[in-house]
Amino acid sequence: AAAITLPAPTGPYNTTLATFKLTDKNRFDPYAPTKTPRALMISVFNPIPASQCSALLTPYMDPITAEYEDAVYAPLGIPAGTFGSLDLQTCKPNPRKAQAYPIVIFSPGSGNSRLGYSAMAQQVSSAGYTVITIDHPYDADIVTFPDHSTIIGIDVEEDTDFAVNVRAQDVSFVLNQLSQPSISE
């Protein structure tokens, strides 16, 4: 599919986008087949004044996730290659100390990837908020890590209370990580 650049957000700010893998070494992943620490992927959208923006096109989602989502949405008539062809208009991260903005945490609906909500998160960020989107492994349909390993979702709806508790622990962990300069700036 031909490259499609999504419209720039309409708020008073432009945005940067960074992704991070966070590993909770104090908690095992309750869904993993082996005893491994819980690892999450997050996206962080930060507002940046237009005067400090060095334009950058950023893929809407990584190629592995895009290919997976293409297959998921093919029965709905979405052409192959659609998700991989989408780009966001972002800015290169600014090495100067970032201004602190109010934080919005976004946890996607069960079975969905955080990446499907990137345009929405970017739009909110352009209004002057740091927006952090979280993938919940085994709950999201797919989570792809920087080393290209993936976790395909399972049906976590059998025990909704348990799934909600795991998500709450994920969000608490992410909030605790905000003190790390690489995430909050």
What positions do the PLM features span?
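Short, low-complexity, polar/charged sequence segments that are solvent-exposed and flexible
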Residues: R38-A39, D62-T65, Q123-S126, I151-G153
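Alpha/beta-hydrolase active-site loop
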Residues: Y138-E185
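Domain-level recognition of soluble alpha/beta enzyme cores
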Residues: A2-V104
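Short substrate-entry loop that stabilizes the transition state in hydrolases
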Residues: G84-T144
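Aromatic-acidic/polar surface patches that form glycan- and anion
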Residues: P33, S113, V164-R167
